[in-house]
Curated annotation (Swiss-Prot):
<dbReference type="Pfam" id="PF01425">
    <property type="entry name" value="Amidase"/>
</dbReference>
<dbReference type="InterPro" id="IPR000120">
    <property type="entry name" value="Amidase"/>
</dbReference>
<dbReference type="GO" id="GO:0005524">
    <property type="term" value="F:ATP binding"/>
</dbReference>
<comment type="subunit">
    <text>Heterotrimer of A, B and C subunits.</text>
</comment>
<keyword id="KW-0436">Ligase</keyword>
<feature type="active site" description="Acyl-ester intermediate">
    <location>
        <position position="182"/>
    </location>
</feature>
<dbReference type="GO" id="GO:0006412">
    <property type="term" value="P:translation"/>
</dbReference>
<dbReference type="InterPro" id="IPR023631">
    <property type="entry name" value="Amidase_dom"/>
</dbReference>
<dbReference type="InterPro" id="IPR004412">
    <property type="entry name" value="GatA"/>
</dbReference>
<comment type="function">
    <text>Allows the formation of correctly charged Gln-tRNA(Gln) through the transamidation of misacylated Glu-tRNA(Gln) in organisms which lack glutaminyl-tRNA synthetase. The reaction takes place in the presence of glutamine and ATP through an activated gamma-phospho-Glu-tRNA(Gln).</text>
</comment>
<dbReference type="InterPro" id="IPR020556">
    <property type="entry name" value="Amidase_CS"/>
</dbReference>
<dbReference type="GO" id="GO:0030956">
    <property type="term" value="C:glutamyl-tRNA(Gln) amidotransferase complex"/>
</dbReference>
<feature type="active site" description="Charge relay system">
    <location>
        <position position="158"/>
    </location>
</feature>
<comment type="similarity">
    <text>Belongs to the amidase family. GatA subfamily.</text>
</comment>
<keyword id="KW-0648">Protein biosynthesis</keyword>
<protein>
    <recommendedName>
        <fullName>Glutamyl-tRNA(Gln) amidotransferase subunit A</fullName>
        <ecNumber>6.3.5.7</ecNumber>
    </recommendedName>
</protein>
<dbReference type="InterPro" id="IPR036928">
    <property type="entry name" value="AS_sf"/>
</dbReference>
Length: 493
């Protein structure tokens, strides 16, 4: 028998409108799952009272025939999104106890459409990480385990709490953010669907900034349809965000039945990199066959500046982070550590408040922006960024509708397995995803298979600017063709 929490978001939405059960019943079922799953550490802050109050309001609207598109659907919110009156920490000690007096635009859009907030989800501190091991509140544990092993594995990052919560059936969907792969990589690691929309499609207002020219909000969900439903509510123009684009938001769910026959799909040769496991290459080849079978045409393409994307990203992103994080000084909000004078207070607060990875990136950013190195590093990285964007522009000008690549260079790994001695080892997790952020394009990760160890593997689709519809249509084809991945056994219950 299917329990309420095993329903997809689309099924739950339709059943609520059909009055098969109430929003309060659904929220209570979800809260019980969350209580059982504390070992995953997916939530930083649970909000059961708020969730039940919102569910009661949803039931009243449904009874009056005033239901919104997400009426009564329980969601998790990445703790990078400001939520009015609810603690927002960015998983950092420096923001512990901070309660915003305002709501982020994206979460406000979700509440406008009737969604219910279950709580705030864990993440890498200030979204800086690829494994969710850098959170001040402890790492998130993936609900997945390798075959025959009880060893904990990472859910990916930085949106590890979002991905783990969705995969473990703790919520029907979750908000996330993606600066270099932080939606797509954890989605691939946990067998969920994650989309990073085109830069400007979703408002950044009220989301704690990491790298402002790269950050973008997006959803993580169990199915392509669920992600499409969430995207429609999250997206939209916001005059409070100067990078928000004033363009109509399509009905993404309606595009899922759109055929892909005649579409031209590019396969970039530069994504065939040394050291990638054979099972990743095999999955990529299988994805090609699925799209061929659906009537798409496959063409080889070249994105020649791909090899420079990762080093350029790790100059641009820390540079912007060092600027954005300068505002945390202990004066107005969050942690304050006393010092002998005002400068001493600044220094003591920032030293105690920021974790190791955040401090590392602030120092890298300050270095590349310094007078003697600005031209040698930052300016050159921005020039490379332009060349990366031009590579994609040429591919799309030649008639390519979308690009298919692996989502990650491996399946999920264990705690402490990567980056403990050399941080670059961890940064290489973003090798297939950072180009998309550097070019401001939409990218979607869809589950496509499992590794030899029984862990989820994903494929990535990269689209033209503001053409998320094509990505959803293609992802729907892959989702239907791929073997169904059973949810992870509830070892934590």
């Amino acid at each position: 028998m299917t329990t309420l929490t095993d329903l997809t978001l689309a099924e739950a939405r339709d059943a609520l409108l059909n009055k098969d059960f109430s929003a309060v019943e659904l929220v209570k079922a979800q809260l019980a799952e969350i209580e059982q799953a504390r070992a995953l550490n997916a939530f930083i802050k649970e909000t059961p009272e708020k969730a039940l109050a919102m569910a009661e309001a949803s039931d009243a609207r449904i009874a009056r025939g005033e239901a919104g598109p997400l009426e009564g659907v329980p969601l998790g919110i990445k703790d990078l999104y400001c939520t009015e009156g609810v603690e927002t920490t960015a998983a950092s000690h420096i923001l512990e106890g901070f309660k915003p007096a305002y709501e982020s635009t994206v979460s406000a859009n979700l509440w406008r459409d009737g969604a219910v907030m279950l709580g705030k989800l864990n993440l890498d501190e200030f979204a800086m990480g690829s494994s969710n091991e850098t959170s001040y509140f402890g790492p998130v544990v993936s609900p997945w385990r390798r075959k025959g092993s009880d060893a904990r594995i990472v859910p990916g990052g930085s949106s590890g709490g979002s991905a783990a919560a969705v995969a473990a059936r703790l919520c029907f969907g979750a908000t996330a953010t993606d600066t270099g792969g932080s939606i797509r990589q954890p989605a691939a690691f946990t067998g969920t669907v994650g989309i990073k929309p085109t830069y400007g499609r979703c408002s950044r207002w009220g989301i704690v900034a990491f790298a402002s020219s790269l950050d973008q909000a997006g959803p993580i969900a169990r199915t392509v349809r669920d992600a499409a439903i969430l995207m429609r509510s999250m997206a939209g123009h916001d005059p409070k965000d100067t990078t928000s684009v004033d363009a109509p938001v399509p009905d993404y769910e309606a595009t899922l039945s759109r055929g892909v026959k005649g579409m031209k799909i590019g396969i970039p040769k530069e994504y065939r990199i040394e050291g990638v496991p054979a099972e990743i290459d095999a999955l990529w080849g299988q994805g090609v066959e699925w799209l061929k079978d659906a009537g798409a045409t496959i063409v080889d393409i070249s994105l020649p500046h791909t090899r420079y994307a990762l080093p350029a990203y790790y100059i641009v992103a820390p540079a912007e982070a060092s600027s954005n994080l300068a505002r945390y000084d202990g004066v107005r909000y969050g942690l304050r550590v006393p010092g002998k004078d005002i400068v001493g207070m600044y220094e003591a607060t920032r030293a105690a408040g920021f974790g190791k990875e955040v401090r590392r990136r602030i120092m890298i950013g300050a270095y590349v922006l310094s007078a003697g190195y600005y031209d040698a590093y930052y300016v050159r990285a921005q020039k490379i960024r332009t060349l990366i964007k031009q590579d994609f522009d040429r591919a799309y000008a030649d008639g390519v509708d979308a690009i298919l690549t692996p989502a990650t260079p491996s399946a999920a790994f264990g705690f402490g397995e990567k980056g403990s001695g050399d941080p670059v080892e961890m940064y290489l997790n973003d090798v297939f995803t950072v180009t998309v952020n550097m070019a401001g394009l939409p990218g979607l990760a869809v589950p496509a298979g499992v590794s030899a160890e029984g862990l989820p593997l994903g494929l990535q689709l990269i689209g033209r600017p503001f053409d998320e519809e094509t990505l959803f249509a293609l992802a729907s084809v892959i989702e239907k063709a791929a073997p169904k991945i059973a949810p992870p056994p509830k070892w934590w219950a």
